[in-house]
Amino acid sequence: MDKTYSPEAIEKALYKKWESHHYFQPRGEGKRFCIMLPPPNVTGSLHMGHGFQHTIMDALTRYHRMLGDKTLWQPGTDHAGISTQLVVERQLEAQGVSRKDLTREQFLDKVWQWKEESGNTITQQMRRLGASVDWSRERFTMDEGLSAAVQKVFVQLYEEGLIYRGTRLVNWDPKLGTAVSDLEVLSEEEDGFLWHIRYPVVDSEEFLIVATTRPETLLGDCAVAIHPDDSRFRHLIGKQVHLPLCDRTIPVIADDYVDKEFGSGCVKITPAHDFNDHEVGKRHQLPQINILTKKGTINKNAPLKYQGMDRFVAREQIIKDLEKEGLLAKTEPHKLKVPRGEKSNVIIEPLLTDQWYVKTKPLAEPAIAAVKKGDIRFIPETWDKTYFQWMDNIEDWCISRQLWWGHRIPAWYDNHGNIYVGYSENDVRFKHKIDQSTPLKQDEDVLDTWFSSALWPFSTLGWPERTPELEQFYPTSVLVTGFDIIFFWVARMIMMGLKFTGKIPFKEVFITGLIRDSEGHKMSKSKGNVLDPLDIVDGIDLDSLIAKRTSNLMLNSVRDRITKATRKEFPEGISAYGTDALRFTYCSLASTGRNVRFDLGRVEGYRNFCNKLWNAARYVLLNTDEEQIDFGDGAFQYSPADQWILSRLQNTVSKVHHYFETYRFDLLANTLYEFVWHEYCDWYLELSKPILQDDQALSAMKRGTRRTLIHVLDQILKLLHPLMPFITEEIWQKTTKFTSENGISIMLSTYPKVNEEFINPAIEEELDWLKSAIQSLRTIRSEMSISPAKLIPLYIRNITPELKERIAKYEKILKTLSKIDKINYLAPDEKVPVSATAVLGEIELLIPMADLIDKEAELSRLNKELAKLNKDIELAQGKLNNPKFTDKAPEEIIAKEKDKLAQAQVAKDKLLQHKNRIESL
């Protein structure tokens, strides 16, 4: 083995071998296990959230494959309607071509061309992270088979009256000219204004003051609402008010929706331009007056003066006109949530438009029942409340989008506006007996991307055909996804799965948290805190990192801020940590919380873990060869240390299975880390040395230790493999000649199971006692600055016959690992010189201090340490007593400072105790 572990030297070659040998394909006749990859956008590249979830899915897939289950991780990509269309439009614009210069067919040809040339970026990146998906089965939401499934579902739902065309309020993006889903609307807090407008009461000197952040929408007002219990305005309920700047009056209505305490307690109701107002309007049978065109300009339903104006130009004009008329009571600054299009960044308008809808209530009822009955289980269980909350209040689903790229709606219109739905124009003509002389025109719209995604678990397995894959792998085993798409994707898959297959789409839903930066902030381009998983794997220099983080940023001030912060956080850029260290970090962070703080320091720690494992394997292989192990006829004798590590291994194996079954990847990673680093490397390898290096030790004992070393290493590699596939495969290939394995690939070997024969609580108790004794003696050495090489005497007080017998049994190990030259037993009242003492149960371990240290030199060193600690304490106290710091600094920074102070004070107390002991010598 090479002296050092170099991930870059092995990862790509190993993955290529796995894929080319088809190791990722389902095999055998074991239990079925299937995971569907949530299809990433074909335009996308791998981000931290993908890396996190893909690691968890891959760990589950590799675990079940090694259990002998017939395992399928089904990959594929999403056509990502808006995103893909925008990418191709921008490419065309760079060539001086507008989408509108092309026919629909010409444009779609360009999109397909782009998809073939550039649409596999994310799948290549998945390979770099070790994803063991079955690439031979890769699907695309617009491939032929999935398109046929989409058509069948649409036609059937329409024929059953569950799809209809209607006029409702939608999120409208005026720049893109399409309806968008709630998930594509980002609401960020921005600085705005609250305009207080007077609405004069008809035939009265009174007026109502209404506060609004969108004065242009008053052109579509249909009422002013007050709370029914608001005594200030109760006398006006049922009266009319003049609508400012418009030649019409509107009623004053009472509704519980109004917050008496906000603004004046009066709310303008604009049913065609606000989702809450729309509901109020329905309750009171108010008209719906749409005042906007699809381009965001004022339409003919408004006074002539404003017609044709852009909505924000109209806003300025309306404010001026209100002032002129004396109807603007006041203007005040106001922070508000502004809904912007995720792709366009323009302000989204609630707009009444004709769209296609799915009637969701009949589909939601069985989907709610499936979770209530326990057929589908959310992990953590608390997420089922979120699911029920959404499903109990479900609205009809707008499924049409005003785009060219996507599944075109299979509906045709004649000249009289009649709608015909079918699989093709010929199908429609045949079904409805329409001859060729009657012109038919297909609907221009495409389906919401989430419509095809909702069919993903069964359409990818061949539905509507009854394929062997559908029979074997549906329902799938588990879905791994984020809480942000429980409604948009998870719920819709459950509804569609039950409707079209009669079965649930998956048995369990594991909801992960969202990856944030080390301080808990959302990762975003504008914050400049985004990390690319592959930059952590391969490393990136500072200049390239800054260029990546600041590309396409318009504002110099933002660019400068991000550059400065990046230089401070990564002065040397990011080191190459390799895939396994990153994957292990992801698993260690996969707790049950909503948010996951990602800290690069942890990746560095787990890179050290890879090094530790590599060095342990080198030690084992250097001390193990075929002659020495002698798997033939030689007898084996197992030392207490061998028996101890084999017993501890069973405990670890048991926990690992439990944590896989309960999706506690954080506890799983921690369990493996503790066993490998502390029990196997720090203790067992050290305990093996006295036996292997002792010329007097029995050959059978040496064989037993060598066999244990290699067996436990083999089991460790298998236990770790689902989390760290590359390093484990590389080492395992070098161990197979000693373990009678087939050596094809670790991923095709058998996952460890608990062997009850090796569980030995008595030996664990003995070795735990021995470890505590050695640890106590090492602590004394460290605290007293005794040279690690110096042999020291040990005195023991309060010894019992049982413990004396135990010490005799382990005397060689105790002396070797603690560097003890002689063990002396004291009578109860026997005096010893000034000693450092450790208490271990009922006995005392004493190390006389005289002659072991240079008293003056040690006191001088301690005084320097104390001076430094006093300075640290003073600085931390100064910060924490300064209101400028405590009032302005983020909570996590204040908490860090408090921790720093507490640690410094503990360290100071220990040093003072040590100083007192030295002074008494």
UniProtKB/Swiss-Prot annotation:
Belongs to the class-I aminoacyl-tRNA synthetase family. ValS type 1 subfamily. Gene3D superfamilies: HUPs, Isoleucyl-tRNA Synthetase, Domain 1, Valyl-tRNA synthetase, C-terminal domain. Monomer. A motif ('KMSKS' region) lies at residues 522-526. Residues 849-921 form a coiled coil. It is found in: Cytoplasm. CDD domains: Anticodon_Ia_Val, ValRS_core. Keywords: Aminoacyl-tRNA synthetase, ATP-binding, Coiled coil, Cytoplasm, Ligase, Nucleotide-binding, Protein biosynthesis. GO terms for cellular component: cytosol. The keyword Zinc does not apply. It comes from the Bacteria. The keyword Phosphoprotein does not apply. It comes from Legionella pneumophila subsp. pneumophila (strain Philadelphia 1 / ATCC 33152 / DSM 7513). The lineage of its organism: Bacteria, Pseudomonadati, Pseudomonadota, Gammaproteobacteria, Legionellales. ATP binds at K525. This is Valine--tRNA ligase. It is an enzyme of class 6 (ligase). Pfam families: Anticodon_1, tRNA-synt_1, Val_tRNA-synt_C. A motif ('HIGH' region) lies at residues 40-50. One of its GO terms (biological process) is valyl-tRNA aminoacylation. Catalyzes the attachment of valine to tRNA(Val). As ValRS can inadvertently accommodate and process structurally similar amino acids such as threonine, to avoid such errors, it has a 'posttransfer' editing activity that hydrolyzes mischarged Thr-tRNA(Val) in a tRNA-dependent manner.
